[in-house]
């Protein structure tokens, strides 16, 4: 268990590495690492919180284990898109997976998520996405991803508070 810092990450901090095509997201949750892990690996829970509130998520394929794959469709009345990837490592404190937006199938990102127990009922989620190019990274950042990340994490806060990830 690590020490809690004085920095406040109750809203997501999204940073681009100037030297690498990397996006880093840091966010603290009033949750245990086990609750966050479950919310990221249980397809029913994942579909309830991921993405912006204006979009619903339908899980098409989900096998959250080393070597497993996933695919989901995000849609609203006037819009539909799909994402897919493979789980490379799934452990209670770390998930490593690929992430591909099917509209750009050649653009594959390698994502690493870690769940750090801060004590006192708080866990820090760190997500790092190594994107295939600086252009791809910058396109992600300008796509409105910040809204989707923050709205999704707010929904995750509610899901955890309701006890759904226990």
Predicted ranges, named:
Residues 1-8, 131-166:
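A conserved amphipathic terminal alpha-helix motif
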Residues 1-56:
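Hydrophobic ligand-binding cavity/cleft-lining segments
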Residues 20-26, 33, 57, 69, ...:
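Intrinsic-disorder/low-complexity, polar/charged segments enriched in Ser/Thr/Lys/Arg/Asp/Glu/Gln
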Residues 22, 96, 100-150:
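Beta-strand/loop substructures that line and gate deep hydrophobic ligand-binding cavities in soluble
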Residues 24-25, 44-82, 166:
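Short beta-edge strand/loop motif at the mouth of beta-sheet-based domains
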Residues 26-27, 59-62, 82-88, 99-100, ...:
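Hydrophobic/aromatic beta-strand elements that line small-molecule binding cavities or substrate pockets
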Residues 33-34, 65, 88-93, 115-124:
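A short, structured loop/turn motif at beta-sheet edges
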Residues 36, 40, 46, 70, ...:
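Hydrophobic pocket/interface hotspot
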């Amino acid at each position: 268990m690590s020490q809690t810092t004085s920095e406040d990450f109750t809203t997501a901090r999204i940073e681009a590495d100037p030297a690498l095509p990397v996006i880093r997201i840091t966010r603290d949750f009033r949750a245990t690492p086990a609750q966050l892990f479950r919310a990221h690996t249980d397809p029913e829970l994942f579909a309830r919180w991921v993405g912006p509130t204006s979009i619903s998520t339908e899980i098409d394929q989900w096998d959250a284990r080393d070597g497993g794959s996933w695919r989901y469709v995000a849609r609203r009345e006037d819009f539909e898109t799909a994402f897919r990837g493979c789980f490379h490592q799934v452990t209670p404190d770390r998930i490593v997976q690929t992430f591909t937006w099917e509209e750009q199938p050649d653009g594959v990102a390698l994502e690493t998520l870690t769940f750090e127990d801060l004590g006192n009922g708080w866990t820090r989620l760190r997500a790092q996405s190594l994107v295939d190019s600086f252009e791809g990274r910058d396109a992600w950042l300008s796509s409105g991803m910040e809204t989707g990340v923050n709205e999704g994490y707010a929904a995750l806060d509610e899901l955890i508070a309701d006890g759904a990830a226990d």
